[in-house]
Amino acid sequence: MSESVIQGSNPDRVLSPTSSKSVTQTVNGSHQFVIQGYSLAKGMGIGKHIASDNFSVGGYQWGIFFYPDGKNPEDNSSYVSVFIALASEGTEVRALFELALVDQSGKGKHKVHSHFERSLDGGPYTLKYRGSMWGYKRFFRRSILETSDYLKDDCLIINCTVGVVVSEILCPQLHSVHVPDSELGSHFGVLLDSMEGSDITFNIAGEKFLAHKLVLAARSPFFKSKFFSEFEANNTEVTINDLEPKVFKALLQFMYKDSLPEDVEPATAHTFERLKLSEIYETLIVKVLAAADKYDLIRLRLLCESHICKGVSVKSVAKILALADRYNAKELKGVCLKFTAENLAAVLETDAYQQMKDECVTLQSELLKAVAGHEEGSNSTGGAKSQSVWAQLSDGGGDTTSRHVRQRTT
């Protein structure tokens, strides 16, 4: 005798609950419509409009229609009309709208009709076909408009915002595939360390470095033009006399691994305050900065600038400004000029500034401009202290252009 057992449902088994969430929101976009020559547009006729260029919001095309003589006969005598029109074929769209006539006096008193940030009893407006519109037949009384700050130099400006309603169901992502970080740098790093397949040798002060032409050409426009030119393409050895081996090694580190070498000096304010400018020029990071500028390695130059920027202080900024100017470090130079302008009185008292003033005469005029821009941006009221600082900067620079800069007074 045999017995068969049919497995049924297990009432004691509890399944894990599932969940989902419906999210409805708007995808917003804006368009500005400038109407130049309003007085010439008047009289074009009832129901005739000036249309903006089409613009895209939420995957649909839209347009703004301005009716200088009104959209309907009953509105012609008193009002201009403004509408937003659906310019896409096909499906119906639910959306929120805002129309704003810009106050051109600068007072910010715009004439705004908006669905946003207020409760709508009937929900968003539905446009069902191309050419369907939302707007106002009586948008603005014409007689008031023509004597208002909304009309300036015969020009009107209308800002339009459209918020297309979209819904989606969000479910927990139970499964995923992990993608590790890019290994490109590490793979090229292995290539640098092994130099397998190298096809170019660099002789740097008697020390030999192997490399790959394609890697260097991809990283540096200088090397690309060097290796792919008609006269240099077949060269397998290059001698460079104006670089130290450790600097060229740093260039290779960057071109293969996209990073600075680990033996670059820490950049601290104390380091740059302690060293003389001539000693700063001999540091590895500054030599790498100079080489990056020469060999058109823009990202390496920015890495160096970012590293050196950590050392900016009242006592060091003049030195760093001088080296930034010397090696075309524009971002670093901008930081130094801004820092100096913000801390002008203290910087002018430092020995480093006095040395920079004598050795980098052309920087004086740039510093004057930076200070002027800073004071204008902060709405400075001047005062005796501010004026004395200006006098010290203007008269003590040694720059013939700065001697003619007139001191600003308030």
From Swiss-Prot:
Q: Which organism is it from?
A: Arabidopsis thaliana
- State how it assembles: Heterodimer with BPM1 and BPM3. Interacts with RAP2-4. Binds to MYB56 at the promoter of FLOWERING LOCUS T (FT).
The segments labelled Disordered in the record are: 1-24
Q: Which UniProt keywords apply?
A: Cytoplasm, Nucleus, Ubl conjugation pathway
Role played: May act as a substrate-specific adapter of an E3 ubiquitin-protein ligase complex (CUL3-RBX1-BTB) which mediates the ubiquitination and subsequent proteasomal degradation of target proteins.
Q: In which pathway does it act?
A: Protein modification; protein ubiquitination
Record's protein name = BTB/POZ and MATH domain-containing protein 5
- Whether Nucleus counts among this entry's keywords is yes
Q: Which gene encodes it?
A: BPM5
Q: What induces it?
A: By drought.
